[in-house]
Every structure is written in structure tokens, then in C-alpha cells.
């Protein structure tokens, strides 16, 4: 048996631990979580039907099943990646599928406070510059790269649309 020393994050006196990673994610600090994990924090789940509000606003989203695997970061809007593994079969990716596809995304985590009919916290990803893709029933990974902003309730649909458009620009810039 070899004795190992604690792993410390560069520039930090604190020992790297799952507690620290969970605290960072709860605060929406995906950059710290990435440094601690050595990879971007992510979730995996099946794309399910939502209220289709994103599509109505001009920003269609892939909604993750509420039982997705992984730790959900704090409420807010994030830049990240959606990795499509293809159609699910019994909750897992189907075998012998063609290549995996990776798309830049603006990701919303929260209960969409502008609207009162959102029953629970959601994770939904808008694929940047792609509108004609059907991901329903596909297994996807959502990787969180950078937090763009916190969740905000808007006074109507028009201010929300303007903000989402800005979020998409900022997400695109964060991912280049």
C-alpha cells in the first residue's frame, strides 16, 4: 500500500474534494469545478418534450429528462456543449450508431421565473446556429463551460427574447 498526499488545487490551500466540487457547482462556478475535476462538469440524459416555449420565442431547446445523471449547477445561463449520442434504447445510447455530434450551446438551468407554469427546475440547451434538428429521444451530454449570468424574471416576452439573443452571442464567444 502506497501512502498518497492530499491533492491540492493550484494556488489553493484547500484539499480537492467532492464537497468542494459540489459547492462550486451549487454556486454556478463551473470554472472552479472544471479546474478541480480536470474536465468540464457535465450531465447525461434523454431529450424529452417540454412546453415548446423556446421554439415559440425563436430559440428551440433540447430539454433534459429530470432524472438525468450528474450534478446540476446553480440556476443561471451557461455556455457549453451538447454532445448527441443518438437515439436512446432503454435509457442508453443505441449500439452501432454513427459518429457522435458536438454542438455549441447556450444552456438554461432553473425554473424560468418569467413564466408561472414551469412546474420544476429544468436543464435546457439551445444549440447555437442550428434550428432544424430533432433530438427527442436522443441521449445527450451537456457540458458546462462558463456561467454567463444568473436567472432573472423579465417583465414580458420581448425583454426576455432580447436577453436570450445576447446570451447566445456571449455563449458563442465563450466557446471559440
Each model region followed by its residue ranges:
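Classical nucleotidyltransferase
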Residues: 1-60, 151-164, 168
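Phosphate/ribose-recognition catalytic cores of enzymes acting on nucleotide-derived substrates
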Residues: 50-176
